[in-house]
């Protein structure tokens, strides 16, 4: 069975594949994960006001177009003293999307006078699975058949015009996962991305502490953890783990 991951980021596809197929025991032989980017599907505009809404929006867009089950996630950082900001704006908190250094610098400036015991935060992820109703068939613009993956372009008059299928939705599932922790005052670590260098998770790997100069023996940031250590406690891993029963149900 093919499942489309609603992303154009191949790194995220690899991470989700690893979590689902290895860490969580989903049968790799029966599931082929493909990215929306590899199918040349456009990114939908994220108009939701919650992580759940945006995850569902992205998964729906893919399932409707392809006729295949779709998985999507939306995640970000919630800082308690900032009224749960940056939230859904985490990736573009400083203006430009994905500018990690600028986002981190702005966050540190905004909570610079907050004492350490009040710098609590959490990463939150919403993971969604949307299953299309393929038995009902698809509405097809242009009046010719479409298989959901191949976009047919043969029009009745012999010209070429893009044709897109639109499948109805059969079911939707969305799950949440949190990784609680706190924001430190300067970046540490070379792994991860986003706010990872500023975030110290509450759950720490046994026997491992920071070796950074002036911070020896302190708890690790997300960016100091290995991928396996981070996946074991991550918000995305927790949300996807909660989604596994719904994915496994598709195989039976």
UniProtKB/Swiss-Prot annotation:
Q: How is the cofactor bound?
A: Binds 1 Mg(2+) ion per subunit.
Q: Mind telling me which Pfam families this protein's record contains?
A: Ham1p_like (PF01725)
Q: Which cysteines are joined by disulfide bonds?
A: none
EC number(s) on file:
3.6.1.66
Requisite cofactors = Mg(2+)
Signal peptide limits: none
Quaternary structure annotation from Swiss-Prot or TrEMBL: Homodimer.
Its family remark reads: Belongs to the HAM1 NTPase family.
> Which PANTHER family is this protein grouped with?
INOSINE TRIPHOSPHATE PYROPHOSPHATASE (PTHR11067:SF9), INOSINE TRIPHOSPHATE PYROPHOSPHATASE/HAM1 PROTEIN (PTHR11067)
Its biological purpose is as follows:
Pyrophosphatase that catalyzes the hydrolysis of nucleoside triphosphates to their monophosphate derivatives, with a high preference for the non-canonical purine nucleotides XTP (xanthosine triphosphate), dITP (deoxyinosine triphosphate) and ITP. Seems to function as a house-cleaning enzyme that removes non-canonical purine nucleotides from the nucleotide pool, thus preventing their incorporation into DNA/RNA and avoiding chromosomal lesions.
The name of this protein is dITP/XTP pyrophosphatase
């Amino acid at each position: 069975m093919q499942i489309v991951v609603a992303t154009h980021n191949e790194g995220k596809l690899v991470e989700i594949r690893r979590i689902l197929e290895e860490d969580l025991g989903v049968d790799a032989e029966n599931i082929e994960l493909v990215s929306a980017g590899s199918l040349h599907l456009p990114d939908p505009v994220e108009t939701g006001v919650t992580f759940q809404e945006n995850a569902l929006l992205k998964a729906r867009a893919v399932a409707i177009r392809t006729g295949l089950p779709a998985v999507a996630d939306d995640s970000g950082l919630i800082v308690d003293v900032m009224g749960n900001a940056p939230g859904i704006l985490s990736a573009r908190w400083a203006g430009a999307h994905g500018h990690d250094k600028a986002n981190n610098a702005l966050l540190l400036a905004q909570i610079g006078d907050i004492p350490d015991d009040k710098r609590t935060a959490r990463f939150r992820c919403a993971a969604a699975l949307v299953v299309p109703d393929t038995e009902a068939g698809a509405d097809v613009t242009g009046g010719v058949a479409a298989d959901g993956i191949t976009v047919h372009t043969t029009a009745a008059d012999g010209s070429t015009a893009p044709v897109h299928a639109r499948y109805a939705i059969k079911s939707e599932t969305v799950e949440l996962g949190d990784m609680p922790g706190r924001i430190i005052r300067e970046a540490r670590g070379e792994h991860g991305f986003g706010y990872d260098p500023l975030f110290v998770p509450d759950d720490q790997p046994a026997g491992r502490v920071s070796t950074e100069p002036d911070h020896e023996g302190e708890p690790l940031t997300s960016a100091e953890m290995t991928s396996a250590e981070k996946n074991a406690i991550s918000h995305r891993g927790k949300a996807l783990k909660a989604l596994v029963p719904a994915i496994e149900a598709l195989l039976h």
